[in-house]
Amino acid sequence: MAALIPQKMFDEQLAAMDIENFAQATIRQVGAVGGALEKNSGTEFLHLEMGVPGLPPETVGVEAEQQALAQGRASIYPSITGIAPLKSEASRFVKAFLDIDVAPEGCIPTVGSMQGGFCLFQICSQCDPKKDTILFIDPGFPVQRQQVRILGIKHESFDIYDFRAEKLGPKLESYLKQGNVAAIIYSNPNNPAWICLTESELRTIGELATKYDTIVLEDLAYMGMDFRKELGHPFKAPFQATAARYTDNYVLMISGSKIFSYAGQRIAIAAISDKLRNRFYPALKERYGIGRFAESYALTFLYAASSGASHSAQYALAAMFKAAADGKLDFVAHTREYAPVSYTHLTLPTILL
């Protein structure tokens, strides 16, 4: 089948945007390339780069945020560690849909998982002087690799495609046994590849993270969107697969952007395991005066980055978490629009970015 977009046009567009390696481009760069090629070629593209199929935001979140604004929350700085309703409802949401116990104290709001991850890369790379490298299990979000470059943090990566099932353990251990990996990051499910790690693979990641004392950063942007399973029923199996069942060294990044279509308000949580939350790191204490992981994450890194997440948006996220855990908001059903999009992506010879 002939290419619908001439290679020359594609190459010229990359050159015009100063992109040397398209595989390493950020999501925003990919979107810009797609937009330009659409305009120049007159060919319609299937856009998956932003992962937003145009769904409306959840009404319960909008109403809760409107109420918070009407009550004057916009004039008040939020607690850097999060408002109490969000912390408690986030903890309950994690239990309802992952069957994992995380104390409210470990659920900390961030300005989207973008900021949450940015600050996690910083703190994880500073916990132990011997561990200064972030390991990416690809495919992931390209901008996260951009973040570690901006921060000057060392990083390694490998593609999960060639190391599924029993091949994952030896490959992952080949990096961890070097002793310099501070954290492992991956997305599950991943967009636009729509690769879902299996329970067995997540067990491998969790057990090796414990063995080598490495922190797992699990990005759950598309939580519940493995539509082959009947996920999304609160407090009932099957639950979202997670490495958190197999290690205490984890942070779950849960964003409102995709699961609640609340991307514009930039609100998420970092759910830190109880053990990691209270773990004391001498290097953090020496550098910042705060040695416990979660306390340092919030009061040092997040505080310096934004002085807190949007006050009113925290009320929105709390309300959506509560409605979902109460069984009144079926966010998995509401996001099922992703299913035909991902199916089209994986089965049709469509031009997509």
Where are these regions (language model features)?
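Conserved core of the PLP fold type I
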Residues: R73-Y212, L217, M223-Y246, V251
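Conserved small/polar residues in nucleotide/adenosyl-binding loops
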Residues: T344-L353
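Short aromatic-enriched loop/helix-cap "lid" or pocket-rim segments at secondary-structure transitions
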Residues: E58-G61, F227-L231, A263-R266
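A structural signal for well-ordered alpha-helical segments within the folded catalytic domains
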Residues: R28, A84, S88, P142, ...
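N-terminal small-domain helix-loop-helix segment of the aminotransferase-like
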Residues: L4-F10, M17-Q115, F321
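Short, solvent-exposed loop/turn segments at secondary-structure junctions
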Residues: G51-L55, I83, M114, F141-P142, ...
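Short beta-strand segments
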Residues: H47-E49, I185-S187, L217, I254, ...
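Conserved core segment of the aminotransferase class I/II
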Residues: R245-R336
